[in-house]
Amino acid sequence: MSDDIKKQLGAVIDSYKEDLCQMADEIFDLAEISGEEYKTSDILCSYLEKEGFVVERGTGLETAFRATWDNGSDGPVIGILVEYDALEKIGHACGHHLQGPAGIGAAIAVKNCLQDYPCRLVVYGTPAEETLGGKIIMLDKGYMKELDLAFMSHGSPNTSVDEKCMALENFVVTFHGVKSHAAISPEEGRSALDAALLSFHAIEMLREHVKDDTRMHYTIRNAGGPPNVVPDLTVAEYTLRSYSTKYLDEVVERFYNILKGAALMTGTTYEVQRDLPFKSKV
């Protein structure tokens, strides 16, 4: 790309800077979590419509959208992907309030400066990145297949054009035991909480025996009730990551063995909800 076009693109973005920064601040204050980004989605869609994009809302997910502009040619279809969900209880700690304004700014700049270049621009709003993996759902429903190439940005303290991307697997596991009074008849109980705690301990033991880039995290969603009752139900959530999808598959297999062992040791049963996987960078 010539320096002249770069200067033109920069000038357009500078002229929209105040609007884009205000938009980012507004989205930051809303801090809508995954799947509930209704006001945020409307802010982004309305601005794109004002700038001449044709917007289709609810594309695969309620808060997703697809905004298009073309100059009547048969050139390449260029995608710009934006995320905008916040983290539950902490807000926009991952910087997704910046992606929508940044992506819209890029799209407007290209639209204004490349009128004579054959191309079609598509801005995809991809919600629920922090939980469901909105892009995966949209791909499975047939969206984005039109794109010849796609770009996205992510907030960071550094400027880079080549970032790594970890594969991720997320599981919600419900352990089932037998309820009993913890003081009068503990021998009759089978603790679902014990099963979850044993699985946590096993993961800690596993850390020494996996590759350095492996990340394993867990939390208890539902511990089961008061301490004087052997809990018959405990719900735990686990997240596993690696920079290699292939290696993560091996870790997942070992994780399933941990669940089997924890249930066997405690005389409990369990069921697994496995969320859509995120693949590592190709």
Regions found by a protein language model. Give the residues of each.
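Metal-dependent amide/peptide-bond hydrolase catalytic core
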Residues: D4, L197-V282
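Residue-level signal for inorganic ion chemistry
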Residues: I27, M138, Y238
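Conserved short loop/turn motifs at secondary-structure junctions
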Residues: I33, Y124-A128, L276-K281
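Solvent-exposed beta-strand sheet faces enriched in polar/charged residues
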Residues: G58, L81, Y124, T219, ...
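Histidine/acidic-residue-rich, glycine-tolerant segments that coordinate divalent metal ions
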Residues: F65-R66, D85-A93, H97-L98, G103-I104, ...
